[in-house]
Swiss-Prot record:
It is a multi-pass membrane protein. It holds the Pfam family Oxidored_q2. Its EC number is 7.1.1.-. The keyword NAD applies. GO terms for cellular component: NADH dehydrogenase complex; plasma membrane. It comes from the Bacteria. Belongs to the complex I subunit 4L family. GO terms for biological process: ATP synthesis coupled electron transport. Signal peptide: none annotated. The keyword Membrane applies. This is NADH-quinone oxidoreductase subunit K.
């Protein structure tokens, strides 16, 4: 049987992979969005693990709110990506300053 520490270690590894993904690739907007989503999923895994092992449902409810915010963040990020690619024909993060109104 898996204990709480196994889930927390898995969550920490996923979080570390996402942080490394953010620091190693600061140019591509798609990779940055995927790394941020992986970071949020690692946090959700920790919430679910704590909620299960403590017998409290509040952590599981909080995960639904995080998933809702993550979906909105992904939609806004992809909308910015589409506008950026349509106007500039590139998805490099360095070119985001040219989207000023």
């Amino acid at each position: 049987m898996l204990s709480l520490s196994h889930y927390l270690i898995l969550g920490a590894v996923l979080f570390a992979i996402s942080v490394v993904g953010i620091f190693l690739n600061r140019k591509n907007l798609i990779v940055l969005l995927m790394a941020i989503e992986l970071m949020l999923l690692a946090v959700n895994l920790n919430f679910i693990a704590f909620s299960h092992y403590l017998g409290d449902i509040a952590g599981q409810v909080f995960v639904f709110f995080i998933l809702t915010v993550a979906a909105a963040e992904s939609a806004i990020g992809l909308a910015i990506l589409v506008v950026m690619f349509r106007n500039l024909r590139t998805i490099h993060v360095d070119d985001l300053d040219s989207l000023k109104g």
